[in-house]
Amino acid sequence: MLCQKYKRGVIQHALSPERKINNSRFPKWQTSCLGDYFTEETIRTSNSKSTPLVSLTVEDGITPKTERYYREFLVTKDGDNYKAVKPGWFAYNPMNAHLGAIAPNHLGYTAAVSGYYNIFSVNEEDTIYFWEEYLTSYPMLIHYKLIATGSLIEKQRVHYSQFVKICRCLPSVEEQRYLSKMFAAINAKIANAETMQRQLEKMRFSLMQQLFI
């Protein structure tokens, strides 16, 4: 979709240390480590009505499990086998970090994810959208691939202990807030455009049906 291509172009430009914003009103980007901005969260929980089990996907981030999953693969193990991910917290899959399996919880409620995942919060809550885009940007995916450990390709992973030690040239927290607002606005516009497109498709389908009745 054109909106997504536009978003990728804007984000690629915005995340380049060489670009200038408003006559360089922000400080020069400095090298720092990811662990300086995150706090690991480890709250054990279970798959319940208060903390329903969700998926972490490369395409859509954190999403509710499908009805089919609950019908066919409902987990019945006792105990707290999962980790809680509160709204705004990130879930991180070490096995698929290089594919972009890192995402914040935008569902609006606390959910449960696989106990294998790492959960972390950002120290500055108003930078969530910046980190959502930065951590899954193309240069970062390449970086994860380069530092992944494991003898077999299909079992390579980037442990959370490696992840937090990644040092990159990063914008100041002030600029992170600015970029976060910009990315959030872009996401909202894209969501509205996609909703409108779905409505138009439904209208088109309905009209086509009426034509051939």
For every predicted segment, state its role.
Residues 21-46:
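Non-catalytic DNA-recognition/assembly elements of restriction-modification systems
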Residues 95, 111-116, 151-174:
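A short glycine-rich beta-alpha junction/loop motif
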